[in-house]
Curated annotation (Swiss-Prot):
Catalyzes the reversible phosphorylation of UMP to UDP. SUPFAM superfamilies: Carbamate kinase-like (SSF53633). It catalyses: UMP + ATP = UDP + ADP. Its main location: cytoplasm. One of its GO terms (molecular function) is UMP kinase activity. Its EC number is 2.7.4.22. The gene is pyrH. The keyword Ribonucleoprotein does not apply. It holds the Pfam family AA_kinase. This is Uridylate kinase. GO terms for biological process: 'de novo' CTP biosynthetic process; UDP biosynthetic process. One of its GO terms (cellular component) is cytoplasm.
Length: 223
């Protein structure tokens, strides 16, 4: 299979060195039998620098560029933990990532273009590579009827259609550094390309494997 992961930067940044090694080992296990791409988010590092940039009057486009640099730093950190299982040089384009996959069974990258979140980059990469599965490993354990951090009555949706996901996510305002289970652009790409997608809690490293063997407790998205 070809599997593309969108790994939230907040998930990765919360790990100490031992935690990073656990994620690296899980990804190596998955890559034994699959071609794996991992797109890493910027997390708190990106939000901190984007916040400071806004404070000094930076445009949203410049804030996006700063966020991309943060994602690439996080990607480089994960690549270092993978210790040769993925290229140390972080690809900066989809073509670079696909070229690297000719040599490596695992490729780790960050953001690509201003205006695209990590989820959107991962969805586009899944589209480019005709991926079998897109896994969005984030800080929530699926898609809910509303924000579970704000609404105690929010209910997790175990399965949903791509069109329903796109409709739900289109109501979320998208700015540099914004957070949502799946961003609106990614949802549109998932819908148009019929990409099988799973949203899982990436804070549990075991969910990276469970997402592909069907034993996860997240949200499955199908066309």
């Amino acid at each position: 299979m070809i599997v593309v992961y969108s790994l939230g930067g907040s998930v990765l940044a919360a790990q100490d060195s031992a935690g990073l090694k656990r994620y690296a080992e899980a990804l190596r296990t998955i890559a034994r039998d699959n071609q794996v791409y991992v797109v890493v988010g910027g997390g708190a590092l990106a939000r901190e620098y984007i916040g400071k940039a806004r404070d000094v009057g930076a445009s949203e486009a410049l804030c996006d560029s700063i966020g991309i640099l943060a994602t690439r730093m996080n990607a480089a950190l994960l690549a270092a933990a993978l210790d040769g299982s993925a290229p140390f040089r972080v690809p900066e384009s989809y073509d670079d990532a696909i070229e690297a996959s000719k040599t490596y069974r695992m490729v780790v990258m960050g953001g690509v273009s201003p205006g695209q979140t990590t989820d959107a980059v991962a969805a586009l990469l899944a589209e480019y590579t005709r991926a079998t599965l897109l896994v969005i490993a984030t800080s929530v354990n699926g898609v809910y009827t509303s924000d579970p951090e704000k609404d105690p009555g929010a209910v997790k949706i175990p399965r949903m259609g791509a069109k329903d996901l796109s409709r739900m996510m289109s109501q979320i305002e998208l700015k540099a550094g914004s957070k949502s289970p799946v961003d609106p652009l990614a949802a549109k790409i998932i819908e148009r390309s019929h990409i099988p997608t799973v949203v899982v809690d990436g804070r549990n490293v075991a969910n990276l494997i469970r997402a592909i063997d069907g034993t996860h407790d997240g949200t499955e998205i199908r066309s």
